[in-house]
UniProtKB/Swiss-Prot annotation:
Protein name (database record): Large ribosomal subunit protein uL3
Location of the region described as Disordered in the Swiss-Prot/TrEMBL record: 1-31, 246-271
Organism the protein comes from: Saccharolobus islandicus (strain M.16.27) (Sulfolobus islandicus)
Family named by the database record: Belongs to the universal ribosomal protein uL3 family.
Subunit architecture: Part of the 50S ribosomal subunit. Forms a cluster with proteins L14 and L24e.
Source species taxonomy: Archaea, Thermoproteota, Thermoprotei, Sulfolobales, Sulfolobaceae
Described purpose of this protein according to its UniProt entry: One of the primary rRNA binding proteins, it binds directly near the 3'-end of the 23S rRNA, where it nucleates assembly of the 50S subunit.
Length: 351
């Protein structure tokens, strides 16, 4: 029945399988872009989703019918307090031709970030006295020498950074989120010097991204629980007449009796999937929360108290969920400047 492929194509995307729950709440990107920059920089950042609002802005997309005119634009608000790099990981190619971690170097200044003991309990033993801190330096001091001696073998560097949820009272948590962020731009020696310089120091989102550029968003979607085939795959509901008395919100058949094909729609987990959305434009990066906080705060979140960004359109995930922001791997356009915003909605979102 090849003719049925035109009138009734298969339901559900095979590119999104398996439709299972994500193994981690803050996923790390599986690929990183190659940037042409003489100076090293981080290729990503972490923020927390606040909610949505809308602005009026001057359309600056080239060849757009509304270019130069004021347009309405829905935006997503993310709160992005500074992140703190704690460790440096060096990757080199192994015998199988795949890059793997050869060692990692923890800076002594990382012990000043006391919340790390909430995530890594074993580090609490290094905070007892000065003697224990010296043991920490002796343990990881040789790691840095190993990195410098194998600099020609290293493929790339990544920084293990921690977020600061303590600065966001709306989240109601103190345990930091740890994630790896790759360093791009410059030569290997310059990347190593950059990493050693920023270890233990706060990095702002303005050091990574700028207004107007396109970025990718990596995160976990909203969880919907167990769902049937109608909602999960959008298959056509069967007619509700006497010959379909066994049910309508189901598929007609699962196939031959030799085993159900993997492509046959079946009920199961819906939502809480790891997904990547490409080319989300940064409309604005602001330091004054009064410019974005609506009357009464954001529903189910509260008010923004730190640096924030506005992303064009909607993004995945629920409110208060950590979202990974990455340099665009395939930007559709490179903007020179940020768009001009003429109005930001500050009316109450509580109805």
């Amino acid at each position: 029945m090849g003719h049925r492929k035109l009138a009734s194509p298969r339901r559900g995307s095979a590119g999104l399988r398996p439709r299972k729950r994500s193994s981690e709440l803050l996923p790390t990107p599986r690929t990183w872009p190659q940037i042409n920059s003489p100076n090293p920089k981080l290729l990503g950042f972490v923020g927390y989703k606040v909610g949505m609002s809308h602005v009026f802005m001057i359309d600056d997309w080239p060849n757009s019918p509304t270019n130069g005119k004021e347009i309405y634009m829905p935006v997503t608000v993310l709160e992005v307090p500074p992140i703190i790099p704690l460790a440096l990981r060096a990757y080199a190619v192994d015998g199988k031709g795949e890059p793997n971690v050869i060692t990692e170097y923890w800076s002594p200044s990382s012990l000043q970030f006391l919340d790390i003991t909430r995530r890594i309990r074993s580090f609490s033993s290094f905070l007892k006295n000065d003697e224990s801190k010296k043991k920490f330096e002796e343990k990881f001091g040789s790691k840095l020498d190993l990195i410098k001696s194998n600099l020609d073998r290293i493929v790339y560097f990544r920084l293990l950074v921690a977020t600061q949820p303590r600065k966001i009272p709306s989240l109601g948590k103190k345990v930091p989120d740890l994630v790896e962020i790759q360093i791009g731009g410059g030569e290997k020696k310059a990347q190593l010097d950059y990493a050693l310089n920023v270890l233990g120091k706060e990095i702002s989102i303005k050091d990574v991204f700028k207004e107007g550029q396109l970025i990718d968003v990596v995160g976990v979607t909203k969880g919907k629980g167990f769902a049937g085939v109608i909602k999960r795959y959008s298959v056509v509901e069967l007619p509700r007449w006497h010959k379909h008395r066994k049910g309508s919100r189901k598929i007609g058949t699962r196939g031959p009796s030799l085993g159900t094909p993997s492509y046959t729609p079946q009920p199961g987990q819906l939502g809480f999937h790891r997904r990547t959305e490409y080319n989300k434009r940064i409309i604005k990066i602001g330091d004054d929360p009064k410019e974005i906080n609506p009357a009464g705060g954001f529903v189910r979140y509260g008010i923004v108290r730190n640096t924030y960004i506005l992303l064009e359109g909607s993004i995945l995930g629920s409110k208060k969920r950590p979202i990974f922001l990455r340099e665009a791997v395939r930007p559709s356009y490179v903007f020179e400047n940020a768009p001009k915003i003429t109005y930001v909605n500050l009316l109450s979102k509580q109805g």
